[in-house]
Amino acid sequence: LFAALGALAAGLPDALAALGIDRLASLRAMFVGYAAAGASIWILYSGIERQPAQEGAAAPAPLGPSRAIVIRLAALFSLDSFAGGLIVNSLLALWLFERFGLSLTAAGAFFFWAGLLSAFSQLLAPRVARRIGLLNTMVFTHIPASLFLILAALAPDLWWALGFLLARSALSQMDVPARSAYVMSVVTPAERTAAASFTAVPRSLAAALSPSLGGALFAAGWLAAPLVACGCLKIAYDLALWQAFRQHPVDEVITKLDSR
């Protein structure tokens, strides 16, 4: 939700420029505000006290019996992250500007609504997972989202493109809570900390590589290529994930999500 508000605030320089305030000064102030927000987050985290381990809880342990499963998941999640990095929000904003001439203020408003849809979709994810399962939630909400991204790349005008992108936002993040729960469900309790880090680090590294490729495709004039490539790679990831793990049993305690 706050990411959505931050996107909306991206239009402030244009709004302040209309009031006679220098646009460049406003942009510089926003960078300072971004740094101040980061410092505030650090202060808040540093004030959190470490909680003692609960009695009877499994002590964290390195990956053991679940190592092979976690390695396969990490490889698949890395493909997903690499695909997502091809069209990060900054590149998507650039695409909207280059393709349709969308202003900074309008782009901020779009990302605000897209962020709200993404946030609410994550709240709906547990309900969907209770009905169809964690793996099916990850796969069968992600594939339509990727198709909407491809359709946006081929859209004939701005309104169709924004409509497809908003539809994508309503589905694309629904797999996030389901993915975390699924990883925890296929490993032993003692391995959960190691599994979380082992799947997160490769995802971050993969996501760091692809924005430069997406930017290079934009610079070469292939404006739709990063969106289409992202959508196709994500669909390939979803199909590979479903094929590899649809028969894999999961911890029933994890999959029985709280119905309250």
Residue ranges with predicted function:
Residues 136-151, 231:
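Structural signature of the two symmetry-related core transmembrane helices
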Residues 104-105, 189-199:
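Loop-to-transmembrane helix entry/capping segments in MFS-fold secondary transporters
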Residues 153-165:
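Helix-loop junctions at membrane interfaces in 12-TM secondary transporters
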Residues 174-187:
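Intracellular juxtamembrane helix-capping segments at the cytosolic ends
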Residues 10, 35-54, 237-245:
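C-terminal membrane-cytosol helix-exit motif in multi-pass small-molecule transporters
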Residues 14, 121-134, 218:
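Helix-to-loop junctions at the C-terminal end of transmembrane segments
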Residues 1-11, 202-210:
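Glycine-rich segments within core transmembrane alpha-helices of 12-TM secondary carriers
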Residues 90-107:
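Short amphipathic helix-loop junctions that connect adjacent transmembrane helices
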